[in-house]
UniProtKB/Swiss-Prot annotation:
Keywords tagged on the record: Acetylation, Cytoplasm, Protease inhibitor, Serine protease inhibitor
Keyword Transmembrane helix: no
UniProt protein name: Serpin B3
Site (Reactive bond): 354-355
BP-aspect Gene Ontology terms: autocrine signaling; negative regulation of catalytic activity; negative regulation of endopeptidase activity; negative regulation of JUN kinase activity; negative regulation of peptidase activity; negative regulation of proteolysis; paracrine signaling; positive regulation of cell migration
Known partners and oligomeric status: Interacts with MAPK8/JNK1.
Its job: May act as a papain-like cysteine protease inhibitor to modulate the host immune response against tumor cells. Also functions as an inhibitor of UV-induced apoptosis via suppression of the activity of c-Jun NH(2)-terminal kinase (JNK1).
Phenotype when changing residue 352 to A: Loss of inhibitory activity
């Protein structure tokens, strides 16, 4: 494996397997947003702390010469993971008429800690960000509000109250925030007049009435016989970004699909070589999902242990030990409409169009499915989710 996008997909999949254990309903998160936030921490981590982060994020598999020293600011090799982030973030934050996509990172540090200039220069270079000093010790609640309002401003006010009351105390030393915002229009919009009330079956025994968008047109499509499912790509305007939907053939087929899914299979099934242009009668729910996660326990379970306790070595940030990450909070929002998608602080969205007469393939998302939003040029998964509960 040699690319950041592959490492991101593997990490995304590992996270999903953790979320599956505890969440039966909707799941929605932004793997690239979590990865880039932890990449900033890695830049100041050393020894065991750094090794654990790299292993969990699969950065240890990104090119042979990924990292020399564990705290790597002196990184001139193009294969380096931080260099790849620099390229990726530059690509994502390019302005375009087709869609809005913005990834914003920020570190909020207790003002009594002095951050090394070397570290500040490195996060500015690679992650286009800075450290903001705040008074956690004397004004924790004020600091929390300040961080939340920054997140809100970066996500078009879609992500509010990222850090709930009580999550920041006077002993907090470092809060790492990543916000991602996406708003796109479909390449082919859905006609609102075709949106009708239809049944959505969370399981075989119950249904809910939902607004179902419809469109009959050509899409990239593949039938996955071995897992009894099918996959469809719905491009956004400009085709730089797409929403990919994985739909089980049976109403209750999602669990089986999730059990057979691997990161490698996901990449293989959804690659354009394996899909063909097909006329499809698409039924896609108009939906909105918002999910919040405190990733501390999840990341610990995955092997990132030291960073959350006294063994943390973040001396690459300040020159001495003592900084400990108190938590990793993540919130994601997605809304899917006829026009397209709006997504934030880790977020994604969808839409639908005109009535078919005869059709080659049916793709009726009237039961639980998986979906993700991908940046096609870099093959990076921005958002990943499961929709099973309207």
């Amino acid at each position: 494996m040699n690319s950041l996008s592959e490492a991101n997909t593997k990490f995304m999949f590992d996270l999903f397997q953790q979320f599956r254990k505890s969440k039966e309903n909707n799941i929605f998160y932004s793997p690239i947003s979590i990865t880039s936030a932890l990449g900033m921490v890695l830049l100041g981590a050393k020894d065991n702390t750094a090794q654990q982060i790299k292993k969990v994020l699969h950065f240890d598999q990104v090119t042979e010469n990924t990292t020399g020293k564990a705290a790597t600011y002196h990184v001139d090799r193009s294969g380096n993971v931080h260099h790849q982030f620099q390229k990726l973030l530059t690509e994502f934050n390019k302005s375009t008429d087709a869609y809005e996509l913005k990834i914003a990172n920020k570190l909020f540090g207790e003002k009594t800690y002095l951050f090394l200039q070397e570290y500040l220069d490195a996060i500015k270079k690679f992650y286009q960000t800075s450290v903001e000093s705040v008074d956690f010790a004397n004004a924790p609640e004020e600091s929390r509000k300040k961080i939340n309002s920054w997140v809100e401003s970066q996500t078009n006010e879609k992500i509010k109250n990222l850090i709930p009351e009580g999550n920041i105390g006077s002993n907090t030393t470092l809060v790492l925030v990543n916000a991602i915002y996406f708003k796109g229009q479909w390449e082919k919009k859905f006609n609102k007049e075709d949106t009708k009330e239809e049944k959505f079956w969370p399981n075989k025994n119950t249904y809910k009435s939902i607004q179902m968008m419809r469109q009959y047109t050509s899409f990239h499509f593949a039938s996955l016989e071995d897992v009894q499912a099918k996959v469809l790509e719905i491009p956004y305007k400009g085709k730089d970004l797409s929403m990919i939907v994985l739909l089980p053939n049976e109403i209750d087929g999602l669990q089986k699909l999730e059990e057979k899914l691997t990161a490698e299979k996901l990449m293989e099934w959804t690659s354009l070589q394996n899909m063909r242009e097909t006329r499809v009668d698409l039924h896609l729910p108009r939906f909105k999902v918002e999910e919040s996660y405190d990733l501390k326990d999840t990341l610990r379970t995955m092997g990132m242990v030291d960073i959350f306790n006294g063994d943390a070595d973040l001396s690459g940030m300040t020159g001495s030990r003592g900084l400990v990450l108190s938590g990793v909070l993540h919130k994601a929002f997605v809304e899917v409409t006829e026009e397209g998608a709006e997504a934030a602080a880790a977020t994604a969205v969808v839409g639908f169009g005109s009535s078919p007469t005869s059709t080659n393939e049916e793709f009726h998302c009237n039961h639980p499915f998986l979906f993700f939003i991908r940046q096609n040029k870099t093959n990076s998964i921005l958002f990943y989710g499961r929709f099973s509960s309207p």
